[in-house]
Amino acid sequence: MEVNTCNIQVLLQAAEYLERREREAEHGYASVLPFYSNGVSDKRKKQKSKSHSSPGNSRSVHNELEKHRRAQLRHCLEQLKQQVPLSSDSSRNTTLNLLRQAQLHIKKLQEQDERAKLLKDRLRWEQRELRTRLEKLQGGSERMRSDSLGSAVSSERSDSEREDVEIDVESMVWTLEADALGSSHAGVDHSYSTSDHAWL
């Protein structure tokens, strides 16, 4: 973002220079460049050292460099127009206004980026809190499940013991009934024997 801001500052200065040159061309006089890039100044020094004897050649080189620089600026401005929201009034969409809008747009994007970072940090913190709560709940449910399984096992044991007791009681009742039947049969046989003796 800082590099973009520096580029915007350079473009602002270039736009002011271009507008000043256009105004001066309308009035018929020229001005001096407010700043020079290192590459352009080095090239101009080399061209001056080579062509002291031919001022026409240096002038054509200067024009070519100026044309190249303007084409580069135009290309950058066209790219900037595609990324910066502009006003509907086309008369106000000058190069200077475009660069100022770009600067405001960059500040707005930086603020949105900061807000997004804060929101992301807050959501991460909430996610960690929810995970710890979920782990606690899962641990509690596992304990409850183990307790319920233990109670089910103990209830099954008590049911089986109750069935054993009932079976023992039934066997005791059965043996008692069998004993009673055996004794009654014995009594009947005895009475028959006594009656036989009486008849005899």
UniProtKB/Swiss-Prot annotation:
SUPFAM superfamilies: HLH, helix-loop-helix DNA-binding domain (SSF47459). GO terms for biological process: regulation of transcription by RNA polymerase II. Efficient DNA binding requires dimerization with another bHLH protein. Binds DNA as a heterodimer with MAX. GO terms for molecular function: DNA-binding transcription factor activity, RNA polymerase II-specific; protein dimerization activity; RNA polymerase II cis-regulatory region sequence-specific DNA binding. The keyword Repressor applies. One of its GO terms (cellular component) is nucleus. Its main location: nucleus. Residues 136-146 have a biased composition (Basic and acidic residues). Residues 57-109 form the bHLH domain. Keywords: DNA-binding, Nucleus, Repressor, Transcription, Transcription regulation. Gene3D superfamilies: Helix-loop-helix DNA-binding domain. Residues 40-69, 136-165 are annotated as: Disordered. Transcriptional repressor. Binds with MAX to form a sequence-specific DNA-binding protein complex which recognizes the core sequence 5'-CAC[GA]TG-3'. This is Max dimerization protein 3. It comes from the Eukaryota. It is found in: Nucleus.
